[in-house]
A protein has these predicted regions:
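Bacterial N-terminal signal peptides that target proteins for export
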Residues: 2-15
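Bacterial N-terminal signal peptides
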Residues: 12-24
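Boundary at the C-terminal end of the N-terminal hydrophobic targeting segment
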Residues: 28-30
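Short, surface-exposed loop or secondary-structure junction motifs
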Residues: 35-36, 144-384
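Short, conserved catalytic-motif segment at the N-terminal edge
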Residues: 38-106, 126, 141-148, 290-292, ...
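Hydrophobic (often cysteine-bearing) scaffold residues that line and stabilize catalytic clefts
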Residues: 51-55, 106-110, 114, 160, ...
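Short active-site loop at a secondary-structure junction
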Residues: 61-74, 93-162, 218-230, 302-305
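Short, well-ordered beta-strand elements
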Residues: 399-401, 407-416
Length: 438
């Protein structure tokens, strides 16, 4: 198997070089994804094709060393696709070459998509950031809050803004350190100790919300940032306001207008041969890797972690945001709404929880907006970027970012849920930024 994987990665690198020769070095080292952006020479938008080629070489070596099974990487600048590669294999158990239209489990990269859905309804005048969550989901009326001395009443209502910025006090069981909350989430079937990839899509969205609403909040609403189940609740709000299942609403208002043809909450039989898979075990730790089954329609469209899609679909979504809410003449959001979403919504008054759930944000020296991590300054963060850039990632290693000042968009798609996730995400970003030459 190892030798076949290495042969596959070498052949993929060779194919990349052949395509470069056919289409020119600045067309990105792989075939242009069918639904991605218009391609352009890297030099025409202030980037170096030779420097972008380092992505192919470096990640090709990572794949050859079995640190990744495969990857799809897309880079756009000034609205033009300047790099696209599909390296390694799609499935380690069946090592056919990775393809640019491979379908990935995007996990928490579903959150920005669901956040956009909520903002669409706000622009429609049907929802407000200040709306109490209980206005749309009555189960959250009169919620309690955990304290060392027991349960107390919430000092204010949980709002839609709290859901969007993860200040609602609805932590993930696997990321919080509060044992009482962990136990309550486990008893409610919303967390399984020792299983970070626990899948709750077998219950309906209504069941999930009813169970979650019975558990006291970890923090007073609006006081503390901790990565959370809030976006799953936000998805239920979108369903309550729109009267439609989340996937249907997104298809009508986002996926179809933007031609995101492969983004959904499960993969139908005709597309299963395109699904990317992970190694059975983490190559660094040997820990077993288990990803969600996307071959059957789930009981709920998990706004927090249930999405699947291609790199080109997510590039179109990201470019829409980079353009201020519009792509190819299809306006999804106002420019002012995108600016609101990608501004700092934590400020100095909201604490970052000293837990693994808080560290998801705090360790990266970013703040948080309405659905995205937002960079507050050019410096401090250990990755290149500029103030105002925004991003998010997914459990299986995926990551995207938009840098408005540099007019730069990056999409990194892998299925590598292990200890090397952060390293590969940062490596991708570093290699993209070093290719800027204007």
């Amino acid at each position: 198997m190892i030798s076949s994987l290495r042969r596959g990665s070498r052949s993929r690198l060779l194919l990349a070089l052949v395509l470069t020769a056919l289409f020119g070095p600045s067309t990105a080292h792989a075939q242009r994804p069918a639904s991605a952006l218009v391609a352009a020479p890297a030099e025409s938008v202030g980037m170096s094709a030779a420097r972008l080629a380092r992505l192919t070489a470096v990640f090709g070596k990572e794949i050859e060393d079995r640190k990744l099974p495969g990857s799809v990487m897309l880079v756009a600048r000034k609205g033009k696709l300047v790099y696209a590669s599909a390296l390694g294999v799609r499935d380690p158990k069946n090592p056919d070459p990775m393809r640019t239209d491979a379908i990935f489990r995007i996990y928490s990269m579903t959150k920005p998509i669901a956040s956009v859905a909520a903002m669409i309804l706000i622009e429609d005048g049907k929802l407000q950031l200040t709306d109490p969550v209980s206005k749309w989901l009555p189960a959250f009326k009169d919620v309690k809050v955990w304290t060392d001395g027991g349960e107390v009443a919430a000092q204010r209502v949980m709002t839609v803004q709290d859901l969007l910025r993860h200040t609602a006090g609805l932590p993930y069981g696997e990321l919080t350190q509060n044992t009482a909350v962990k136990d309550a989430l486990a008893k409610a079937g919303l967390f399984k100790p020792g299983v970070i990839e626990f899948d709750v899509r077998d219950m309906t969205g209504a069941e999930q919300v009813e169970r979650l609403a019975r558990i006291p909040l970890l923090y007073q609403p609006g006081t503390t940032w901790e990565y959370s189940l809030a976006t799953d609740v936000l998805g239920r709000v979108v369903e309550a306001v729109s009267g439609k299942r989340l996937g249907v609403f997104l298809s009508e208002r986002l996926f179809t207008p933007l031609r995101m043809t492969d983004t959904a909450f499960w993969v139908p039989p005709a597309k299963l041969a395109r699904v990317a898979e992970a190694f059975d075990k983490d190559p660094l730790t040997g820990t077993a890797i288990r990803l969600i089954d996307v071959s059957k329609e789930p009981a709920n469209d998990s706004a927090g972690a249930g999405g699947v899609g291609t790199a080109s679909d997510y590039l179109r979504f990201s470019q829409m945001l980079a353009n201020g809410g519009v792509l190819d003449g299809q306006r999804v959001l106002s420019r002012t709404t995108v600016r609101l979403m990608t501004s700092d919504h934590l400020g100095s008054r909201i604490a970052i929880a000293p837990t693994p759930g808080g560290g998801v944000l705090g360790a990266s020296t970013y703040t948080f907006g309405l659905g995205f991590a937002v960079r507050p300054s050019d410096g401090i963060a250990p990755v290149p970027g500029t103030a105002g850039d925004f991003n998010w990632g997914g459990y299986a290693g995926t990551r995207f970012w938009v840098d408005p000042k540099e007019q730069l968009v990056g999409v990194f798609m892998v299925q590598s849920a292990g200890a090397l996730r952060a390293y590969h995400r940062e490596l991708f970003r570093q290699l993209v930024y070093q290719a800027i030459v204007d």
